[in-house]
Amino acid sequence: MKARILFAILVAGVSILLARVPPAQPHRIGPADIYPDPVRTPGAANPQINQENIGDNICNPQWSTKQIRPPAEYTSRLKRKQLREYGDTVHQTRAELINPSTGKVDTTRCVAHSDNMACYEEDHLIPLEDGGNPTDPKNLWPEAYNTRVGGTIMGAHQKDVVEGFIHDEICYDIPGAKKNSYIPATISITLKRGQQILAGDWYACYESIRKGEPCK
């Protein structure tokens, strides 16, 4: 009887331990601070968009992300909450972000882990234009503008380049599809594959684009 009790305790302990182990972080070629935490923000797809209907929504020139974009009140509230959760708590006033030459906010003045909301875009990891979920917190995170790779800014604006390029690869085979990228797509990928690239390693795709290669 004692042996059975000890075995049950052991099994329960192992189960609790396994439940606390976060999923393994996917291999990514860039530094960790340009990506969201894969546990908090793994990405989430829009259940209303699938491979069969992309011609009616994301690839349709008449369709716009404005139709499904969440209100600013929601994303601002979530951004404030997630900044705390992500540990972005280094105090920085708006005055510290002002460029004296222009009198405007200059995000290159943002320090690492700044608590100033102007230093971030509350971004969809899988973008709306690529079938991402509009409101699921697992698909949203405060993406910094001023993160760098080898001294080069690599943040929210650079990810925007990838988002449009992936969109055009997803829509490559759709007749009359809208174009979101100034860089022409050369191959067709599935909606699912495009979302995997964006959630997995958008920066690897950015490097491929920079070399004149497709993301696949």
Model-derived segments and their meaning:
Residues 3-121, 128-216:
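Nuclease and nuclease-like effector domains acting on nucleic acids or nucleotide cofactors
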